[in-house]
Amino acid sequence: VRRRERYDAIRDILTRRDWDALEKLPATGGQILRALMLFVQDNGALVRWRAVEALGVKAKALFPEDRAVREVIRSFIWTMCDESGNLCRMAPEAIGEILAMRPDLRPEFAHLLPQYMVEEPFESGAMWALCRLAEAGHAADPDSLRGLEACFGHKEPRRAGLSRRLARLAGLKPSRAGYPPVSFEDYDPSTGTLKMAT
């Protein structure tokens, strides 16, 4: 399958959210993962989120010894460096989803995510990734969450909401009550749609 045909096929798969078709695609795991990386920067929010989900689905389906997953994670980490010249704003979410589906890779990569909670423009994405990992049974080191409450009242609703969600998942209680309610757009993996979350 030519690269353009593969790209078009994956876009169709993401549109339909057809993970069986993703598995049957005539391409190597690395080729599919690299193509999905492109869709994480798509103009459409729903396509981006489904690409994130698909990265986890495909990573889980590959054999543990397949180096393609590690290479893609390292590529996402590189896209969070200014030197890359191609910042991928949803790189933390992609890494978090892959690690949620691949517990064997968490010791190698999960500890890298907390540092991005204070790194523009990845703060909210890093929080989402840590929430995803916590929901998958991998809690962040409490020391890495110090200062999280400073985001509870952040003017950006997503950052405020995700910081509160992460604190709840980590069992951290706010030092005071009275933070105003927030709502923000989030991806619902149970339905494959975007919805308002709190």
Which residues make up each language-model segment?
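N-terminal alpha-helical scaffold/docking segments in eukaryotic complex subunits
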Residues: V1-P64, A167-G171, V182-T198
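Amphipathic alpha-helical scaffolding segments comprising HEAT/armadillo-like alpha-solenoid repeats
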Residues: R2-E5, P26-V40, A61-I77, P103-Y116, ...
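Conserved hydrophobic register position within alpha-solenoid helical repeats
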Residues: D18-A21, A51, A91, A126-A129, ...
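Solvent-exposed loop and edge beta-strand segments that line ligand/cofactor-binding
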Residues: Q41-N43, M80-N86, E119
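Residue-level signature of alpha-solenoid helical repeat scaffolds
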Residues: E53-V57, P92-E97, W128-R132, R165-L169
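Ordered, amphipathic secondary-structure segments that act as subunit-interaction surfaces
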Residues: S84-A94
